[in-house]
Amino acid sequence: MSRLSPVNQARWARFRHNRRGYWSLWIFLVLFGLSLCSELIANDKPLLVRYDGSWYFPLLKNYSESDFGGPLASQADYQDPWLKQRLENNGWVLWAPIRFGATSINFATNKPFPSPPSRQNWLGTDANGGDVLARILYGTRISVLFGLMLTLCSSVMGVLAGALQGYYGGKVDLWGQRFIEVWSGMPTLFLIILLSSVVQPNFWWLLAITVLFGWMSLVGVVRAEFLRTRNFDYIRAAQALGVSDRSIILRHMLPNAMVATLTFLPFILCSSITTLTSLDFLGFGLPLGSPSLGELLLQGKNNLQAPWLGITAFLSVAILLSLLIFIGEAVRDAFDPNKAV
């Protein structure tokens, strides 16, 4: 903390003073960290195998059944009772706490899908027999990574467009504003539905489409800040000394605009996660079978006789978005110099 400037130290103190936002940040980081380690927490493959004096790492490498003394050269099925017994008799196996992956199906249960919570499936199974907790972990990772990438890409494009409009003004600003007015009126959802009938949606395809239509949220904030600061004396002096426009924008004007921009980022991230969840809920998101919070919400709606699906999905989304909103409020207070610690 000693390396921070006095201004940033005061901002950090104001952020920590907001206890709700401060602890929400830590809880969010812990949950996101757990989701990044989903393969170590929920997996239908062993993490480590000791067999006949040799070490095997199924999490990192695919082994055939013949590697463990089986008759077939096909990929080993670690849920096969015969292979399980053989591994236990000739060595030992380290399993993940949850023995189901994102696409695993619990064939051992004698209850119809979706089945209620049990010792095997702590939060029950979905309509396809997948473990709900495992799909929540993997779905949270996909949602947050999608949100972070969408927030980063759209923020860069929005800041760049707002900076150019605000700095140059005139026709650049006029035509830029007219273009944004037209572009923001495009029916994004209908375009996604139309394109989904032609192209199979995937993570990168959805990210590109949402970035293409979602970069305008920061343009107005950055543009207003550049319009305000471009007539300041130090900017005029830099222009008179022959400093390049690029240097003036990046070194002298952008840092001031970023103060307002940073306060919006947690809310943009929240909106980005909601976008993917909504598309998955409507059936125009990730491919069928992908772990997704929106897809689990859809299953909860379609299976009202299995309330654990809807309740689990709703709580997961609500907690995630609430944490981000609390963080955003704390960041906003931290950058407000009128807030007392």
Swiss-Prot record:
Residues 1-21, 165-178, 223-252, 329-341 are cytoplasmic. It is a multi-pass membrane protein. Its main location: membrane. One of its GO terms (cellular component) is membrane. InterPro entries: MetI-like (IPR000515), MetI-like_sf (IPR035906). The chain crosses the membrane at residues 22-42, 144-164, 179-199, 202-222, 253-273, 308-328. GO terms for biological process: microcin transport; oligopeptide transmembrane transport; peptide transport. Residues 140-332 form the ABC transmembrane type-1 domain. Keywords: Cell inner membrane, Cell membrane, Membrane, Transmembrane, Transmembrane helix, Transport. Residues 43-143, 200-201, 274-307 are periplasmic. Probably part of a binding-protein-dependent transport system. Probably responsible for the translocation of the substrate across the membrane. NCBIfam families: PRK15021.1 (NF011596). Belongs to the binding-protein-dependent transport system permease family. OppBC subfamily. This is Inner membrane ABC transporter permease protein YejE. It comes from Escherichia coli (strain K12).
